[in-house]
Amino acid sequence: LLLSQSKDLIDRMIKDNNKIVQFSCFPLLYQINYFDRQWAEERMINLFKLDIRMVGVMYSRNYLLQMYNEYPQDVLQIINTCFMSQDKRLIEIGGYAIGELYITKDEFKDTIINIKMMNKNQKNAIVHMAVCYLNVPEYRNKSKEIILRYIRFSDQISYPMWNIFRDNMLDLESDS
């Protein structure tokens, strides 16, 4: 009974024109996700499509990536919208997601290789995610490929590359 009442309340909140009310749905959706995943995910996707800024809500990118297998077209569209946004935070979220989906699922290949069409924030977000995956053995080579390509073809990378050396992510013998 409580779950169905909560769902009714959330559906009304999503239809509300007040963005703050819509924004406040996310903590509730995160909890309902444990009981009725499909229902919660459909509402999250709907909210992202209603207002792309909702992707900026804490943990939304993680949920968005988890929804990829079930709703790939919706997720790819939402991520691309973030990446092409004028909002720096959304560009960063979109870039992180593009980097991660390219590295783990081979999505966004055309975007990744089209460095000249990207702005500085887009490039830095993708490189940042590639650096994060350097420590994952199965994705290490793909991560190195991205980092090298972006360093070679762009002078706009401002990600602190010294972190790679400080955190022992590269081995001078095996990675030379």
Regions found by a protein language model. Name each.
Residues 1-176:
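Non-catalytic all-alpha helical scaffold/repeat segments
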